[in-house]
Amino acid sequence: MQPSETIRYHGLDVLRASAMLLGLVFHAPILYYIPEIADGFKDLGISKDTMPEMELWVSVIAQWIHSWRMPVFFLISGFFSALVLHRNGLVYFLKDRFVRIGLTLIIFASLMDILDGNPTGKLNHFWFLYYLLIITALFVLTVSFGRNSAAYHLAQGLLASMQRRSGLIPFAAVMILARIICDFIDGGTVKIPTTYFDIKLGGLMYYTVWFFAGAGLFARIAILEILCQPRTLIMLGTAAMFVFPFHHAYADGFFGHLRDPDIGFGDTLMGSFFAAATTFLWSLFALGITHKFVTRGHAIITWLVELSYPVYLFHLP
């Protein structure tokens, strides 16, 4: 099944917008899971030493959002990157990405870095644009020069198998293994950069995998129809709800913050496995459910989609 030249993927638009806006919810309790930020408010009597422990219900919501939000964002970014390249060609794609990602990163990350009174090249919450810029460059190189590589043909074979529901099993195995490897590269869990020179290889590799999975999804668009079948949604949703409590029990902070330095190898491995499984299941469930039920445009949907990106950029974590 070839992608349509004119079809609009409203469900994916809504999912991407939701992922952006949920970032505001995720960042709301940021002083709890990155308590060192609280030290910037010592004049107000707030510091990491005075921060109480995060309540369970807040932790559950934050971990649930954290488990799938950014992987889904990079997945959809890969999908729409492949779509724009397919419909408009390489020159348009490069210009579009330079404006949407490159200029946005330079302007807004620099502005926030300057406004805090200590400009040191900090990325703050714009780290995802920095990684997206790097990954997009890798994507262009792969499309231009990598089509004859063994990795490319292996990925095509994996995607071909996913045109059946049973094909989700090898896909899950690859994504879970990728997460475990990337976690250990970054010292136990994937991390994010704080400055332009602070690239975390595991995190970059992990989000690259999700981006290329999204690009592959566009190439094998029939997979979307499998994901939104009722039987598939029930299977993914049930498994996702079953696995999440284990993920929450083994979760050890956020992006490495609050991580217990004495955690053992076994607990690290189990935590990585459950994190990977939770991410995979919730991401595909969200993809399938939105594609199934959001099938047409609406003024509210358009407003939500157009508003989500600038709101996320301008909010202060």
Language model region names:
Residues 1-317:
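Alpha-helical transmembrane segments and their immediate juxtamembrane cytosolic regions
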